[in-house]
Amino acid sequence: VIGRGECADPQECKTIADLGVDILAAGIGNIHGVYPANWEGLSFETLAAVKEAVGDMPLVLHGGTGIPDDQITKAISLGVAKINVNTECQLVFAEATRKYIEEGKDLKGKGFDPRKLLLPGYEAILAKVEEKMNLFGSVGKA
């Protein structure tokens, strides 16, 4: 995907919200996966219009990986209640696992044991999730 991502029509969002859904994911310029260099950022104008149209309904931000922290916190302030960052978790998992193998740790002792080989990736995901929870303001909330 190139460019800025799709932006939802606020009235279509209201129509969907009126069906009784619990939470709504609306495009505000976000993209799944890694963002291209020419990405223009989130459309806060669209987000504000969607929020006005749907009222108290919590909003989801798909494609949260790679969005600058200041844009994430602004999106939260405008009604985003759930942010998906799975690509970011996958990237840190792969990086940590790759490092373990490139350092030859899988060849030492029982380093090939999946419980050992995958542990750095698991720990990298834990650290990333903790970082994101702090950024999102979700620590200590159910």
Model regions: which residues?
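Alpha/beta enzyme core
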Residues: 1-57, 69-85, 91-98, 103, ...
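Structural detector of well-ordered beta-strand residues that form the stable sheet scaffold
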Residues: 60-62
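Short, hydrophobic-biased amphipathic alpha-helical segments
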Residues: 114-117, 121-135
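Flexible, glycine/charged-enriched surface loops at secondary-structure junctions
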Residues: 106-119, 138-142
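Short amphipathic helix-turn modules centered on a small-residue break
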Residues: 103-108, 126
